[in-house]
Amino acid sequence: MQTSPLLENLIESLRCLPGVGPKSAQRMAYHLLQRDRSGGMNLARALTEAMSKIGHCEHCRTFTEEDICSICDNPRRQNSRLLCVVEMPADIQAIEQTGQFSGRYFVLMGHLSPLDGIGPREIGLDLLQRRLQQEQFNEVILATNPTVEGDATANYIAELCNQQNIKVSRIAHGIPVGGELETVDGTTLTHSFLGRRTIG
C-alpha cells in the first residue's frame, strides 16, 4: 500500500529523536494523526518556536532565550568563585535540583572524542581557558560523565586548571560508571558533589 508522502516525511522526521526507530516513529505519527491532532499542532508550534528562539548563553553556553541565562545573570552567582564544568545543559538541571551548588557553570556541549573528530575546540575548551584567565575562580568542579570520554575530558581540563594554579576537583562516588548525570537521582548526585576529590 502506498502511503502519503506527508506521512512518510513525518515518520522520517520523528526518527531524529534519540532512541526512536522506524516502528516507534510510525506509532507516534499514527497516534498524533488518529487521536491527538491538537497535541500534534501544539508540538509543531513548540518545536518551531524553540528552534528559532533558543540559543546559547554567552557566558556558560547553556540553552536560553536571552543573551545571558538566568543563572549567569543572578547577582549572587556572579560573585561565586566556583565553576562547575558539565557536558550538557541537562546536567545543569540535574545539579540545580540537588540544591548543593550555588556557583557558576560552563557547558561543553559534549566531550572529547578524537575518533569522532571532536577535539578541544569543538567542545569550547578555548572559551573555557579564556574564561579561566579572565575570571578569578578558586575552584573548578568537573562534573563530566564517568565514561572513558568523560574521564579524558576531565583530565584535559584539569591540566588547563593546573597551568593556572586553580584548584580542580571532580564529583566522585555515587554515579555509576558508564552512567549519565541527567538520569541520576538527586540523592546520589548530592553525595557525588559532597564527595568530590581534588585532581592533580
Curated annotation (Swiss-Prot):
It holds the Pfam family RecR_HhH. GO terms for biological process: DNA recombination; DNA repair. Keywords: DNA damage, DNA recombination, DNA repair, Metal-binding, Zinc, Zinc-finger. InterPro entries: DNA_Rcmb_RecR, Rcmb_RecR, Rcmb_RecR_Znf, TOPRIM_dom, TOPRIM_RecR. A zinc finger (C4-type) spans 57-72. Belongs to the RecR family. May play a role in DNA repair. It seems to be involved in an RecBC-independent recombinational process of DNA repair. It may act with RecF and RecO. This is Recombination protein RecR. It comes from Mannheimia succiniciproducens (strain KCTC 0769BP / MBEL55E). The gene is recR.
